[in-house]
A protein has these predicted regions:
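Ankyrin repeat domain, specifically the short helix-to-loop turn at the C-terminus of the second helix
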Residues: 93-99, 151-162, 181-189, 213-223, ...
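Terminal, low-structured helical/coil segments at or just beyond the last alpha-helical repeat
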Residues: 382-407
Length: 407
């Protein structure tokens, strides 16, 4: 751990003067200077013959740098970042690759002010991009003239900078996989907050491709995703589902507890209503999950591999449950979608439009979050009676009615 506190706005002249003072003190055999030399110099030096280079090395190491050139490079980099002189920054970083921060070590010594300066520069550049009409990673990558900005963001990330946590969380909340991947590339500490892993599972948004990419980025950064069928489904990993099915031929008929779908190991909430979905998923099958998450490819794979399109969720002691996956098409956080590929797929594969179930459902964060009970309803009846019509997909109701569905 560094013995000296590195200033957040350093100037190289400060350190030059400190090195001269240290040399003077060690030659005078001042105890504090002798202690510094004993702790930070790799060799035993006779104080009477100590040179300025020795004092500079000791001073640099007391600030957490490996050498005087590294300390000087860190000061130069901090100054360049503070003045948005990114050409100078590129030069010093190229000459001193040891400035790159190991994310597994804490921000201390000279790493702290360098990372702090890089944080601020990332925020400035991101705001400038927004002012230029660039609001997503895809938009940035589509503009070749902005490649230097992207390269600078990546460099700032290597130097220890991180994008603001609210930007990272925002990309997770709406499942913008490309944005999350870019933010991770430029320094977001994906492992720092398991809350982001919980959010990607529990969010109201529906974008399977974005969700899959976020989870794969998390996995590549060491987030410990459980090896379970629900997690394989969350990730859209058909290869993992195939392996789970090989090990458990009855898998597609199995039902899963809430904790299997939203694991506590990823900081998912104890309060079940904070996992945002349509028809209840606790006690439901993988097909119910795939339909609720609007993952057409996974739903089709499950049906192709023998999943029962009319499989029912568990029924609890109060007689609630028993719904089929078709119910998950009806009440949804994505009620305004323009197409209904999941409802169409289920009906084409033989889903009963008049299956009956009893469901207790409330929507957290809605106008009326309290749970309501709907006894012995069909998918059509549930949708028409549901207390918050803003959560009902009328496109799904229309398709169900066309297939003979009634209340």
């Amino acid at each position: 751990m560094p013995a000296r506190q590195f200033p957040f706005r350093p100037h190289l002249d400060q350190f030059r003067n400190q090195a001269k003072d240290l040399l003077r003190d060690v030659r005078a055999e001042a105890q504090s200077a002798l202690d510094d030399f004993r702790e930070f110099h790799p060799e035993r030096i006779d104080p009477s013959i100590a040179a300025l280079a020795d004092a500079q090395l000791v001073l640099a190491r007391s600030y957490g740098a490996s050498s005087w050139p590294q300390l000087a490079a860190a000061v130069t980099a901090i100054d360049a970042i503070s003045h948005d002189d990114f050409e100078a920054l590129r030069k010093v970083a190229a000459a001193h690759p040891d400035l790159a921060r190991d994310r597994d070590r804490p921000r201390d010594g000279w790493h702290a002010p360098l990372a702090s300066a890089a944080d601020a520069a990332i925020r400035r550049l991101m705001l400038q991009l927004r002012e230029r009409g660039v609001h997503s990673a895809d938009a940035l990558l589509a503009r070749p003239e902005l490649q230097p900005v992207l390269d600078t963001l990546r460099l700032l990330g290597r130097l220890g900078g991180s994008p603001a946590g609210d930007w990272v969380g925002g990309s997770v909340e709406v499942l913008r996989g490309s944005d999350f991947a870019l933010l991770a590339e430029i320094g977001a500490d994906v492992r720092a907050s398991l809350g982001w892993a919980a959010l990607v599972l529990e969010t109201y948004a529906r974008d399977p491709a974005g969700k899959h990419r976020i989870l794969e980025v998390m996995a590549s950064h060491g987030v410990p995703l459980p090896d379970s069928p629900p997690m394989a489904l969350h990730r859209g990993r058909l290869d993992l589902l195939e392996e789970h099915l090989r090990r458990d031929p009855a898998l597609l008929a199995r039902t899963f507890a809430h904790e299997d779908i939203y694991p506590a190991s990823l900081a998912c909430h104890d309060e079940h209503t904070l996992a945002l979905h349509g028809a209840p998923l606790a006690g439901a099958t993988l097909l119910h999950m795939a339909v609720d998450y609007e993952d057409l490819d996974v739903a089709r794979w499950l049906l192709d591999h023998g999943a029962d399109v009319n499989a029912r969720a568990e029924i609890d002691a109060a007689g609630l449950g028993g719904h089929t996956a078709l119910f998950n098409c009806v009440v949804t956080y994505n009620a305004g979608r323009k197409d209904e590929p999941l409802a169409r797929l289920l009906l084409e594969r033989g889903a009963d439009p008049n299956a009956r179930a009893s469901i207790r459902k409330g929507f957290a964060f809605s106008r009326d979050p309290s749970p309501h009970e709907y006894r012995d309803v069909t998918p059509l009846g549930w949708g028409r009676r549901f207390h918050d019509q803003g959560m009902v997909s009328h496109g799904a109701l229309r398709l169900i009615a066309e297939r003979g569905g009634h209340e």
